[in-house]
Every structure is written in C-alpha cells, then in structure tokens.
Amino acid sequence: MTTTVDLVPGLITTRDAIAAAYGCGTFQGIEPADEAGKVFVYSDPFAGEEYGYTFDGRAEDDEFGPLYLYTGAGPNGDQKPSGRNGSLLSHAEKNREVHLFVAHGKVPGSGAMQQRYIGQMVLDPVKPYDIRRGPGRDGVMRNVLVFRFRPAEGTTPAWTEADQTPAAAKTTIEVTDPAVAVPAPVVLPQQSGAKVKKTEQHNTSETIADIPAGQRKVLRREGELVRAFAAHLAAAGHKTHSFQITIAGEPGVLTPDLYDATDHVLYEAKGLTTRANVRMAIGQLADYRRHIPGRKELRVAVLLPSKPTVDVKDLLGEEYVELVYQTDHGFVGWPLAYT
C-alpha cells in the first residue's frame, strides 16, 4: 500500500486509489481487501439498466430506516450466495467492514470512472438479500441477489437525489419461484476505521433503526409458513409459483408470497395472526391482484399461522378474501370453497 485514503462520506475518488490504499482489486463490483479487513462495494445503477433491470439504488425508507439495494456478482446464470457474494454475507463473522461507493461520472480527461463514497454499511439483519429476476449479460433471465444495506451505526451517508432507485420504464410481470427461503440473519458488526459524523438516534432520515429480534422471528415464521403450505399444495398435485411485478414510473418491485396456478389463487402470508397484519395482507392483495393475468377470475386468500378472531374472519369475508390457517394437523380452510 503506497497511499492513504480517508474514508469520509462524500469523498470523490477512484477504484485505483482505493486499491492502492487498501490492497483490493479494481474490476469487480465487490472487492474484498482481506488484510485491511474491509469489503468495498461499487454500485452503478446505470450499468444495470444496460441489461434491463434497475435494482441498485436507495429504496424508500421503511420502518427500520434508510435502505440501499445492491445487485450481487455474477454476469450470467443464477447468482449464488458464495464467492464475492459470500464475502458480503460473511463480513460480520469475519469482522470486515463494508464500504459503499456509487459511480460518479468520469475523471476529467480520462475514461476512468469516479467513485463517490456513500459510507460504511451493514447488511440488513432481518433480511440480508432478496432474490429477484433479471436478465444476465447473455440476455437470459436468471435469479439475482439484491443485497439490502443499512447505514452502520454512527454513519451519516452521503446520499443524493441521484441515488434513488430508478423508476421502471414499463409495467411487467415475471413468473418466479415462491419466496419461501428466508436468508440467515446477519449479526451487526461494531463500526471502526471510518471517519463519520455521529448522528442522533431520533434523526430518522439518516440513522439505522434498532431492529428488534422479534421482527426477525416473525419474518422467519412467515417464510416457514409459506414453505409448509407450498409443500402441502405440491403434495396435492398443485403447481405453485409467484410473480415479480414492476410498475411503470415507480422504483422497486411487487412480490406476492405464493400463487396456486392450479386453482388460480393468490396467497399473502403473515407471520403473526393480528388484526394489523390481516389488514395489511388485505391491502397487499388488493394491490397485487390488479396486475395478475386473469384478475376477474382470480381469488385471493390470507395465509396465517393460527386461527384469527371471529371479527377478523368477518372482515376477510366482507372483503371477499379467503382464509387459510395452519394447525397441528394441516391447513384449515383449504381446499377453498368454490363460490
């Protein structure tokens, strides 16, 4: 290492400068620097647009705070949680920091790309990545890993409006496998080595939320519920999948939990049987169904881990939403009654 680079959010630098300072490579989007104990991530949303997908960028803040999405490594074929992608997933257990850069135009008088340093990140501890469908460099659709970054504690990210996830150019619907596997949670590492400005915990626009372990358990319970019900349907000879829906003019994608192609039923699962969760599921199904082929004949159902109250059952009935819930002996409410 022949130079030093102070990692201050907002810094404009180059891959070569980072490589010279920390001993990493310069050509890949994910560049581990083993001796320095860091993993450098270079995001370029416009590179994704070249191949027909726009996953990279700052997503809408959720109840846990800011969120940045980043498409994993692998130009063709299904991306795997190994290799360079694995270096992100294992960064906490190996005590490596993750540092995010975004492409920032060309170096004046040169073809080299400038990089703007956003700040130190951690993988979302509830859901480290989503699996999305997108074309490879060869034009063939495949599964891609979309990592979910949160600002590390104490980091004030150097976001700009240009970092927002690009809006989809058109409305599309892509058949996908059901999202039944929940990635293993990632332990949040302690921050060190990056120069950052400490933010107040109540500055919701710029600070990472304290994500409770309970939320992680609910998400895992939801994934296990979908997996069990998909297996139940398969044993009955039913074909299942899900959808990835993009909406023209909007960033991100819609991803219903499970579609029973045999009975033309769309299911939305919840990990807790509460009124709030059921109301959320009703709204999600109302949104999803507008984009599903054969929407007039489509039936929708809520999948729950236990029996809801009588009034919640009545709510579902008034909204013409079917109910299926799990018991020790299987699933009550399935097969659905034909009406």
Where would I find each of the regions flagged by the language model?
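Conserved catalytic cores of phosphodiester-cleaving nucleases, focusing on short active-site segments
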Residues: 229, 258-273
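Nucleic-acid nuclease catalytic cores
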Residues: 102, 108-112, 271-274, 290-325
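Acidic, glycine-rich low-complexity segments with interspersed aromatic residues
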Residues: 2-115
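Active-site-adjacent loop/helix micro-motif of nuclease/hydrolase catalytic cores
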Residues: 273-284
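Compact mixed alphabeta submodule
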Residues: 110-181
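Acidic-basic catalytic patches of nuclease active cores, encompassing PD-(D/E)XK
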Residues: 195-245
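Interdomain/boundary linker segments immediately adjacent to catalytic/signaling cores
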Residues: 158-217
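Charged, structured surface patches that assemble and position nucleic-acid processing machinery
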Residues: 322-332, 336-339
